[in-house]
């Protein structure tokens, strides 16, 4: 008989408390973990199942787990899954929240028409950097439509809705916030729910691409049935990874949480309704990097093989991935330059290039240029074995060319070549100028 697993599966408030108070780094200890890795929070979930490239790195004191941030940073790097009320526009709601929280900026993940209610992801301060990534995510709606004439059978309505799936031509309605030009939008599924012949009204569920007008789908439904139709009511069930069944808050919750924080210094309500920005990235493939290279990435450096600790399965070239720290903080969204099998087999090269940096600069200390290769390179420049730009010259030893791997891209090499070409062109221009001057002198004579 094997040893019994002492780790218990926690649920509800107990799980939330354990995630907030627990330490999810791996210190050397004989104690059993309180939580199974499948219950670790946010980007650290199933951390033990990631592919390991190396376990050797120096942990830094800077940085903190997303759930343990102080309340100011917790709010500025968080978002709401807001239940938008009917009548005010999305921009009005977002500006009200900005005024309530007294934050620098707010944004949202896709406009809802004034009369439409439901999921609206409201991003605060630093999280606005992720608003674009959520705007392109899929949306799900529940719609009530009304037909202008009677329909003999419910099945006709169901068949007509099934026809309105796939890539559809749409022109925005007469009253809309965008230019009325023909465009293609994809409807993934139209699920018929109910139809009442007496009221000539029905309900259906629509899963579609962002930017799809459900109002236009209702008009097209009426055209297919030959009786005309219109949308009566609409609610968004899901926006990206957030749906109405999970952590949805109202405007009153935001007001109450801010009131408690201001008057009684009680953070619990605010921490309950605000979610860390890492929750928006849980569907992305992950790459974990060393603490020493985090600040370099924040300054725009590429993600190289020596800086990687762990990485996910099924990473594909050209796809978006999230670069994270060992504490579970999101550093940036990057475009993968290698797949999983390549990362496992090579010893140098560019793994990914950053697309959108999320973490602020200088949260972690500057550690670039302190490694053994960089230190040796600096010394060689000082001794004159390399030129002032760190490139080989006549005195450079041959062993250096074999040891040192240049990771600069082709574009950078081309840029370096262009000045020589310009120098060659310069004498030609001068000669042309001199000829002109001679001709002008002859004219004046």
UniProtKB/Swiss-Prot annotation:
Principal localisation: nucleus
Region (Disordered): 1-32, 386-445
Localization terms from the record: Nucleus, Nucleolus
Signal peptide: none
Bias kind Polar residues: ranges: 20-32
Pfam families: DKCLD, PUA, TruB_C_2, TruB_N
Catalytic activity: a uridine in RNA = a pseudouridine in RNA
InterPro entries named in the record: Dyskerin-like (IPR012960), PsdUridine_synth_cat_dom_sf (IPR020103), PsdUridine_synth_N (IPR002501), PUA (IPR002478), PUA-like_sf (IPR015947), PUA_sf (IPR036974), tRNA_PsdUridine_synth_B_fam (IPR004802), TruB_C (IPR032819)
Entry EC no(s): 5.4.99.-
Gene3D superfamilies, per the entry: Pseudouridine synthase, PUA domain
Occurrences of domain PUA (ranges): 284-359
Cellular component terms per the entry's GO annotation: box H/ACA snoRNP complex
BP terms from Gene Ontology: box H/ACA sno(s)RNA 3'-end processing; mRNA pseudouridine synthesis; rRNA pseudouridine synthesis; snRNA pseudouridine synthesis
Family stated for the protein in its record: Belongs to the pseudouridine synthase TruB family.
Subunit structure: Component of the small nucleolar ribonucleoprotein particle containing H/ACA-type snoRNAs (H/ACA snoRNPs).
The name this protein goes by in its record: Putative H/ACA ribonucleoprotein complex subunit 4
Organism (species): Caenorhabditis elegans
Gene name of this polypeptide: dkc-1
């Amino acid at each position: 008989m094997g040893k019994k697993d002492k780790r218990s599966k926690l649920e509800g408030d107990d799980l939330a408390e354990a995630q907030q108070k627990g330490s999810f780094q791996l210190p050397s200890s004989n104690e059993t973990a309180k939580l199974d890795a499948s219950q670790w929070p946010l980007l650290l979930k199933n951390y033990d199942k990631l592919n390991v490239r190396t376990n050797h790195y120096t942990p830094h004191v800077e940085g903190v787990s997303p759930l343990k941030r102080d309340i100011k940073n917790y709010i500025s790097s968080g978002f709401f899954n807001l239940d938008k009320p009917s009548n005010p526009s999305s921009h009005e709601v977002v500006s009200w929240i900005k005024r309530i929280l007294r934050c620098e900026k707010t944004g949202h993940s896709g406009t809802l028409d004034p009369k439409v209610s439901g999921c609206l992801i409201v991003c605060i301060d630093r999280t606005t950097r992720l608003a674009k990534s959520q705007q392109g995510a899929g949306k799900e709606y529940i719609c009530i439509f009304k037909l202008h004439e009677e329909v003999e059978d419910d099945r006709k309505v169901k068949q007509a809705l099934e026809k309105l799936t796939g890539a559809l031509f749409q022109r925005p309605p007469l009253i809309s916030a965008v230019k009325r030009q023909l465009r293609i939008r994809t409807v993934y599924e139209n699920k018929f729910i109910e139809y009442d012949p007496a009221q000539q009204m029905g309900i259906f569920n629509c899963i579609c691409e962002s930017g799809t007008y459900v109002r236009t789908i209702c008009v097209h439904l009426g055209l297919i049935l030959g009786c005309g139709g219109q949308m009566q009511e609409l609610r968004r069930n899901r926006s990206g990874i957030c749906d109405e069944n999970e952590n949805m808050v109202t405007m009153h919750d935001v007001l109450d949480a801010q009131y408690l924080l201001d008057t009684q210094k009680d953070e619990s309500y605010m921490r309950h309704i605000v979610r860390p920005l890492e929750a928006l990235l849980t569907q992305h493939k992950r790459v974990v990097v060393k603490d020493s290279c985090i600040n370099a990435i924040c300054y725009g450096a590429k993600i190289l093989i020596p800086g990687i600790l762990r990485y996910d399965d099924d990473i594909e070239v050209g796809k978006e991935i999230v670069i994270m720290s060992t504490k579970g903080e999101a550093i940036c969204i990057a475009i993968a330059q290698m797949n999983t099998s390549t990362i496992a087999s090579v010893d140098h090269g560019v793994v990914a290039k950053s697309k959108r940096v999320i973490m602020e600069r200088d949260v972690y200390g500057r550690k670039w240029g302190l490694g053994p290769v960089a230190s040796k390179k600096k010394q060689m420049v000082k001794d004159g074995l390399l030129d002032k730009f760190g490139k080989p010259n006549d005195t450079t030893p041959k062993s250096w060319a074999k040891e040192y791997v240049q990771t600069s891209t082709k574009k950078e090499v081309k840029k370096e070549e262009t000045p020589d070409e310009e120098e060659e062109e310069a004498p030609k221009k001068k000669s042309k100028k001199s000829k002109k001057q001679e001709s002008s002198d002859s004219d004046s004579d």
